Swiss-Prot record:
It is found in: Cell inner membrane. It comes from Escherichia coli (strain UTI89 / UPEC). It is a peripheral membrane protein. The keyword Secreted does not apply. This is Cytochrome c biogenesis ATP-binding export protein CcmA. The keyword Cell cycle does not apply. One of its GO terms (molecular function) is ATP hydrolysis activity. The lineage of its organism: Bacteria, Pseudomonadati, Pseudomonadota, Gammaproteobacteria, Enterobacterales. Keywords: ATP-binding, Cell inner membrane, Cell membrane, Cytochrome c-type biogenesis, Membrane, Nucleotide-binding, Translocase, Transport. Gene3D superfamilies: P-loop containing nucleotide triphosphate hydrolases.
Amino acid sequence: MGMLEARELLCERDERTLFSGLSFTLNAGEWVQITGSNGAGKTTLLRLLTGLSRPDAGEVLWQGQPLHQVRDSYHQNLLWIGHQPGIKTRLTALENLHFYHRDGDTAQCLEALAQAGLAGFEDIPVNQLSAGQQRRVALARLWLTRATLWILDEPFTAIDVNGVDRLTQRMAQHTEQGGIVILTTHQPLNVAESKIRRISLTQTGAA
């Protein structure tokens, strides 16, 4: 039994099958990239794995239990960062981290922002930051969260090369400590092929 399991997932949109019979099992320490052409259903799959959407058939299990039966404990173990940063634009970068991580002290939040490349921008309202900086505010949570499972939809969007390298290193550290990372990205990952598992979406499931 793996940590996270997709079992015979079917997803249809507008009378079109995105994928069917999609099954896979993820274990502690795995780093997974979901691949596929535009419109293949990558974001849709991530939303199914987070429990935000339901498949047309099949189920997702966490530690052997269907998500709907363990929703609270699952979400305590999950960090989801989607296409939209999901941050409060009227708050500062530092206030955003305090909002999402109420048990984190100011020093920890400042360190997380520095790791994300936002040193010197802590007290600026998010609506005054660039798109890339706003993305970094959301991604700074990677240095604070205690969640086991990270699901990240295009985390490198609007991030420069140095930022991508820093984020990649943080993901590597998380998986080395037994965490799981699932992501989509159009950018090449500067990681040894042996460290990345790729699940390619096709209409008949995963290739």
